[in-house]
Amino acid sequence: MALGGEERKRRKGSERRQSSGDGVSCAASDYLVGQVADSLRGGPRPPGGGTGRLAALFSTAEPSAPPVFVPVPQETSKKRKLDDDDDDEEESVSQTKKPVLQEPSRKVKVKKLSDADKRLANRESALASADLEEELHQDQGQGRRRRSQSRGKVADGEALDVALSLAKDGGQRTKIPVNPEEERLKNERTVFVGNLPVTCNKKKLKSFFKEYGQVESVRFRSVMPAEGTLTKKLAAIKRKFHPDQKSINAYVVFKDESAAAKALQRNGAQIAEGFRIRVDLASETASRDKRSVFVGNLPYKIEDSALEEHFLDCGSIVAVRIVRNPLTGVGRGFGYVLFENTDAVHLALKLNNSELMGRKLRVMRSVNKEKLKQQNSNPSLKKDVIKPKQRLNFTSKEGKFHSKEGKFHSKNAFIGEKAVLMKKKKKGQKKKVQMKKPRKQQ
C-alpha cells in the first residue's frame, strides 16, 4: 500500500511540471506587444488581431475532455499505519459489540412419576418432618431443664423480685408459698387500726404511732376505688377513693412486739373530727369470739359510728366491723361488735329484735367457723331436732299412730279418713237412651 502511494505522487509531480512548462512557452510565444493597450483603448485593432493568440485567452472554448479528479495521497506512511491500526481496533470493537444470539433453550422432559414413586416420596417427606419435630422437642426440653436448673439455684429467702419474675406465667403472678410460722410472728407485731378517715396517709399514721416504737410498714384495707379500672392498691397510693366512702382500715406492723402492745393505748383516740379509731392486735382472734356478737339485718348504708352508738349502753366497745362488698364498698347487711369483757355480751344479746334505722336487728353470739365445722362433722354434738316433715303410719284401729321414730301420740289426735275417689262426669255428656226394639207380629 505504501509503495503504490509513492508511485502516484511521482507521476502527479511530473505531470504538473510538464503542464507548467507548456503554459509558459505558449504564453511567451503568442503574446504581442500592445495587444492589451489596444484592447483597453478601444481603438482600431491591427489586422488579424481578432484571431490572435490574446483573444484566445478570453474565449470560452469547450473542453476537449472532462476533467479527471484524483484523490489526494496521504503525506506520511506513519499516519497511514496508525489509521490502519485504528480501523482494525474499530472492527474488533464492532465485532465484540454485536449482540450474541441466544441459543434456543432445550426443552426438559418431565418424567411422569408412577404410583410407587409417589408413595415413596410421601414417605420420605413424612420422615423428614418427623425428624424436624423431634429436634424441636429436644430443644424445648433442654430449654426447660436450663430454666429449672436456674430456678433451683435461687436460694430460699432471696430477693422477692427474683421470685416474682420466676413465678410469672402468662402475665399473671402466682401466689408465693408463705411460711405459717413467719406469718404468726408477724401478726404478733401487727396492729389493726379501724375507722380511719380517707384523708389519712402512711406518713400521718406513722407519726401517730411513732412514740410507741419504730413502724416497719403500713397497709391500707377496705379501699373502694373511684374507677373500675384502678386496683385497690393503686387507688390507695393515688388517693382516689369512691366519693361515697368515708372511712378505711389499716394494718400497722412494728419491729418489736412490745411496741405493738403499747400501741393499744391509742384505742378510742380521736385522729380526726368525728373519727374515733379502733386499735387491736391482729393475733387476738380466739379471745374475740367470746367477747363479740354477730349483728344481722343491718341497713346497707349504715356507718360504724351508728352501730357503735346503738350498743354503747351494754359496755365499753373495743371494735365495730361491718362486712362490706370488696368491689363496691357497700355493706352486706351484717357485722360484728367486740366488747372488752364477756359481761357486755349478755347485755348485747337482749337487744335482739331492737330497731335501728327502721330495721329489726338480729343479735347472736359470734361463733368460730372452725367450731361450726367440727359440730357439723360430729353427729354426737348435734342436738335432737324434730324434722318438720315426718311420715305417719296408721297401724291400729284404736286411734294410736306413731312416726318412724317410734313415738306414740294420744288417742284424741285427729287421724283422718281415707277419701273415696269419685269419677267426675264430663260436661255436655248426654245420657244414652236405649231404644226399645219393636216386637215381631205373629
From Swiss-Prot:
SUPFAM superfamilies linked: RNA-binding domain, RBD
Region described as Disordered: spans on this chain: 1-26, 60-157, 418-442
Main localisation: nucleus
Crosslinked residue numbers (Glycyl lysine isopeptide (Lys-Gly) (interchain with G-Cter in SUMO2)): 246
Residues modified to N6-acetyllysine: 153
Modified residues (Phosphoserine): 292
Single GO MF annotation: RNA binding
One Pfam family from the record: RRM_1
Keywords: Acetylation, Isopeptide bond, Nucleus, Phosphoprotein, Repeat, RNA-binding, Ubl conjugation
Basic residues compositional bias, start-end: 421-442
Disulphide-bridged cysteine pairs: none
Basic and acidic residues bias locations: 112-122
Annotated localization: Nucleus, Nucleolus
RRM domain boundaries: 189-284, 291-368
Domain of life: Eukaryota
Gene Ontology annotations for the cellular component aspect, listed alphabetically: chromosome; nucleolus; nucleoplasm
Gene3D superfamilies on file: 3.30.70.330
Family named by the database record: Belongs to the RRM RBM34 family.
Protein name, entry field: RNA-binding protein 34
